[in-house]
Regions:
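Secretory targeting and sorting signals
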Residues: 1-24
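Polybasic, low-complexity, intrinsically disordered segments
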Residues: 21-32, 37, 50, 57, ...
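Peptidoglycan-targeting cell-wall enzymes and recognition modules
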Residues: 26-50, 54, 77-144, 148-151, ...
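Membrane-embedded alpha-helical segments and adjacent helix-loop junctions characteristic
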Residues: 54-56, 71
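Structural helix-adjacent loops and short alpha-helical linkers that scaffold large soluble proteins
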Residues: 60-63
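Alpha-helical scaffolds flanking conserved acidic
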Residues: 65-71, 142-147
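Short beta-strand segments
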Residues: 66-75, 81-83
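Extracellularly exposed regions in secreted/surface proteins, prominently low-complexity, repeat-rich
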Residues: 155-180, 278-287
Length: 287
């Protein structure tokens, strides 16, 4: 606490200005209803267009398509902040998610949107890490991307893509384009042995690391026109991590019969902005 210094002479009274409305509200600015693409949650009773654009802006700030969260919310809740006993919010979040970073999501739509976008970013990262196309580049893949986030029953996975047009109509081009300020690919170091013995090791084995940043990594194995993929995995923070890409039963059978086969091995690293780096080597598979 600073020491008070007595003032000798007349007491000077300085009138402090009245606190602004912003300060009186506890530091939270009131929603700007003139903003066509609101940065602040507009409220449960807001028009569907404003709710959709709030979601679209949040997605764009994370480098993801405007329509993605809107399509999900239309399908899961009809674009309403539901309060069911087991599933709640705009995205039908299960009660088991009410913990950690998302604790209190039922009363906080910002947390709901954060959960959806966090999970969508992870799904996207996993896809590109195993050599699949970036779903953000193809609007026809938005539905399957959402399905990997929401994880509905298999028969309901196709229920998201039909809402692409409605989502676009609600957003109506009012929001700025998705941010793409992180374009630096992760640095990848990979060790791919030229002779491989997949029948003994359970698949094609590689060792890798991302020395400068967090990443997810995967392996693809192409033999002729057939491609198999490992699951994406986060490498250990230090040293090299071993990944194994299993071969199909048919490929193993052919390898036993032929004795050897040529394969193209690609190791891929992806960061959380879906930037990728790859290393490729042609190897000999020995039975």
């Amino acid at each position: 606490m600073r020491r008070l210094i007595p003032i000798v002479g007349a007491l000077v009274v300085i009138a402090a200005p009245a606190p602004s409305g912003w300060a009186q509200s506890g530091g939270t600015p009131a929603p700007d209803f003139s903003e066509p693409c609101p940065p602040v949650y507009p409220g449960d009773s807001a028009a569907r267009e404003r709710l959709a654009r709030w979601m679209a802006r949040g997605a764009a700030d994370r480098g993801m398509p405007h329509e993605l969260p809107v399509m999900a919310a239309i399908a899961e809740s009809g674009l309403r902040n539901l309060s069911g006993s087991t599933y709640a919010g705009y995205f039908g979040m299960h009660e088991s998610l009410n913990t950690g970073d998302y604790r209190g999501f039922r009363r906080n739509p910002d947390l709901q949107l954060r959960w959806f976008l966090d999970t969508a970013a992870l799904v996207r990262q996993r896809r590109v890490a195993v050599g699949r196309p970036d779903p953000a580049a193809d609007p026809s893949s938005f539905g399957s991307w959402i399905a990997d986030v929401e994880r509905p029953a298999p028969e309901n996975r196709t229920g998201y893509q039909p809402h692409l047009g409605e989502a676009g109509d609600l957003i109506a081009g009012k929001c700025a384009a998705p941010v793409r300020d992180d374009t630096a690919a992760p640095r990848l170091e990979a060790r791919i042995a030229r002779p491989q013995h997949p029948l003994a090791t359970g698949g094609v084995v590689v060792r890798l690391r991302c020395p400068d940043s967090d990443c997810l990594a995967g392996v693809t194995v192409m033999i002729g026109t057939r491609t198999t993929r490992s699951a994406a995995r986060e490498p250990a923070p230090t040293g090299f991590t071993t990944l194994t890409a299993p071969l199909s039963r048919k490929t193993r059978r052919k390898l036993r019969a032929a004795g050897t086969a040529r394969a193209t091995i690609t190791v891929i690293a992806a960061d959380n902005a879906a930037n990728t780096t790859s290393r490729t080597r042609v190897v000999t598979l020995e039975g």
